[in-house]
Amino acid sequence: MKRNKELLLSELNSLPGLSSFKKELECIVDVFIANEKKAGSGKKSDKFLRLVFSGNPGTGKSTAARILGGIYGELGVLSKGRFVEINRSDLVSEYSALTSAKIREAVSKAKGGVLFIDEASSLSENKTEAAHGAIDTLLALMRDNQNDLLVILADYPDKMKEFLNSNASLASCFHVIAFNDDNF
């Protein structure tokens, strides 16, 4: 099916600001459209199914994530239009086993759509076994569901940089998109 890039991006382009994100997303859409033409179906790229939205509050990260999920759905990259937004309190318990169960539940709800983890750096704040377990479980579930799950981690730039640097596996598997204060 031929994809009309302008139509796919129309909702995003109607928003004020987000200029750097719009340029980045246009490139991502080009990659998926080119892969679709080459392979006959929207070939998926892990690089664009694991994203970090780094920016201050009010820069449009949550809004952009919702729109991106819709675009990925239209491209056939994701099978459903689900958008699940969670934060640390939804995931981490004082017990590792309960933390793993909460993360599995969140991924299960989001499968086929977007799992948006706001203030993601707080997953590693207290350096407990449960916090480390949360990250390890999330990484394992991302691998297991890599073809039908968009995971977006969001946070302040300085906190996100520290978070990604705290775990080599995190840093290597996420593509970072910066949201500037002048976006709105």
Where are the model-predicted features located?
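Walker A/P-loop
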Residues: 43-81, 108
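Conserved nucleotide-binding/hydrolysis micro-motifs of P-loop NTPases
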Residues: 59, 90-92, 121-123, 156-161, ...
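Pre-Walker A (pre-P-loop) alpha-helix and adjacent loop at the N terminus of AAA/AAA+ ATPase modules
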Residues: 7-51, 70
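A short helix-turn-beta junction within AAA+ P-loop NTPase domains corresponding to the substrate/partner-engaging
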Residues: 164-181
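Flexible beta-alpha connector loops of hexameric P-loop NTPases
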Residues: 88-98, 122-132, 177-178
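Short glycine-rich substrate-engagement loop in P-loop NTPases that contacts/grips substrate
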Residues: 80-110
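Substrate-engagement module of ASCE P-loop NTPases
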Residues: 107-109, 134-149
